[in-house]
UniProtKB/Swiss-Prot annotation:
Species name: Ailanthus altissima (Tree-of-heaven)
Any one GO CC term of the record: endoplasmic reticulum
Catalyzed chemical reaction(s): 7,8-epoxymelianol = protoglabretal
Biological or metabolic pathway of the protein: Secondary metabolite biosynthesis; terpenoid biosynthesis
Name of the protein in its database record: Protoglabretal synthase ISM2
Length: 219
């Protein structure tokens, strides 16, 4: 008999330790940390020497939050393969034990998930924080950087869903956790990158068109 609540039930997790914190406690800490980052970035954006638009400020928040999630949350998971054994109540271990109720591939160390998260931790996370700097300073490469990052996030999320569906989509303990974690939280990494891709595409296209018009007038 399985000693864990995850699906599939025949998943073997030796010495599994259930969550020591309540679900509300885990979400409260997560929410508080996210709010502090959002508030801090909003304040810093307001003090920028440039007159940043609200959209730019929200983009700074997105890249800061997602970058820190990649580096800290996903970094912990990547380098802590036996987090499910944790008996100390470690916050990050508790977060992942809870999330695995919606996608047990994080407990079983599914190769597709390890690959996706490895790229996110090592490349996308640091580059996302660099995007915050690029927006704040109005760097010319800001839109190209954001487009590249959003494409990687969108591609990684697409693989995340497709690999689950191709293998039977049977990694959630129940429908509630399936929709709350796998669909809703996972879908966030499709929705926001898609919107950023569209915006950056329009900005870059407009800039190229402007340059073409200048060249046409010059010649």
């Amino acid at each position: 008999m399985s000693n864990h609540p995850y699906s599939p039930r025949d998943l073997i997790l030796p010495d599994f330790t259930p969550n020591l914190r309540s679900v509300s406690d885990v979400h409260a800490w997560n929410g508080a940390a996210t709010f502090l980052v959002m508030y801090g970035i909003w304040v810093l954006a307001g003090r920028s020497s440039l007159k940043l638009s609200k959209t730019d400020k929200w983009l700074m928040i997105w890249w800061a939050v997602s970058g820190l999630i990649h580096i800290i949350h996903e970094g912990y998971w990547l380098f802590s393969p036996e987090f499910y054994k944790d008996k100390s109540g470690n916050y990050f271990a508790e977060v992942w034990k809870e999330y695995c109720k919606g996608d047990s591939r994080y407990a079983s160390r599914h190769s597709a998930v390890v690959g996706i998260e490895g790229i996110a931790v090592i490349i996308v996370g640091p580059a996302s924080l660099f995007a915050v700097y690029a927006i704040a300073k109005g760097k010319s490469y800001s839109y190209i950087l954001q487009l590249a990052l959003a494409l990687v996030q969108f591609y990684g999320s697409t693989l995340y869903f497709i690999t689950a569906f191709l293998e039977g989509d049977n990694f959630a303990m129940d429908r509630d956790h399936y929709y709350k974690y796998f669909i809703a939280q996972g879908g966030t990494w499709l929705l926001f990158p898609a919107l950023i891709i569209i915006r950056c595409w329009k900005k870059i296209s407009a800039a190229c068109e402007f340059q073409d018009q200048k060249k046409a007038k010059f010649y």
